[in-house]
Amino acid sequence: MSTQRRMVFNDNYWGPPRERLPELRLRASTQTKVSPLTYSHTVGRGEQTGQGFRYPVALAVNPRTGLMYVANRSYEYRIELKRLTICTVDEHFVGQFSTGGFDDGQIFWPRGLAIDQEDKVYLSDEWLNRISIWSGDGEYLGKWGTAGSGAGELNRPAGIAFDSQDNLLVVDGSNHRIQKFTKEGKFLAQWGSFGNGDGQFNFPWGIEIDSHDHVYVADWRNDRIQKFSPEGDFVMKFGSSGSGDGQFNRPSDVAVDKDGDIYVTDWSNDRLQMFDSGGNHLYTFLGEGTLSQWGNSKLDANNYMWNERQGAWGLEREKYFEHPIAVDVDPEGRILVLEPYRTRIQVYTKNK
């Protein structure tokens, strides 16, 4: 066997070259505060099908069933690997559904996931400019949406989220606005336009709706988070461009827990940031990921892969976040951080 040392960057990733190779660097936290979160475990491994992920980009947890849905974008030259995975935060693999393509029930560039009060799964597809719908066990139910810039039309839809009335809010990314629909696809309202003023957007991405129906939007290219009333009136904003605490370099998603604390995946800064309800910075997390049960089980069954890991260098990097793309809070209050390039979800619990 060759003694050449190889660099390994993620949990069991053996796939094709990544779409983007970020700057590699060792990081050390200089924070003196006690962390408000404790790392729990990791879910996921790189896998072409079945128990694992392939370039996962979105997740959603059903608060009634506990099932977690993960959208796998894969790569354009392996569209058969595009799929939705069903599992749990406790690493129980349930199944998968859909595949890559342009037909009804297929996906191409999945971007956002949300679950309605009837346990149906909704997915935004930024290539197909539509919302697709499945039952909780993966039966295709229908779709809606057309491409364009008029009211109710979509241009690269991104994050999606349901409010308390079961209306679906859609981040209409390339139209730089938020649109509200009934879950059947009837247009209700919209707000936003291109720009950097209050209530304007520059390629917005992720969205969150809190228990009071306030709307939070990750304003991606403006490097900030904006908060709106349920009617779409501007409430506040926080963040600026940079790499310091409270600054962002392309924030991709936002989540709010039951205490009102806010979590932001700071995509190009390779980190998760936590804020209080007023947008004041509380803590910056760099990642503490370990091998998942899925990853360990695969390595246990393959001595060659174990030996390759033992001979690899750069393993100290794999615990850190690499371009975290989505964040969610599950029914138990656990913080879930999704990483496409490391094909995993890091799970954290909030300290009392």
What are these regions (language model features)?
Residues S2-K352:
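Eukaryotic scaffold repeat domains enriched in small/polar residues
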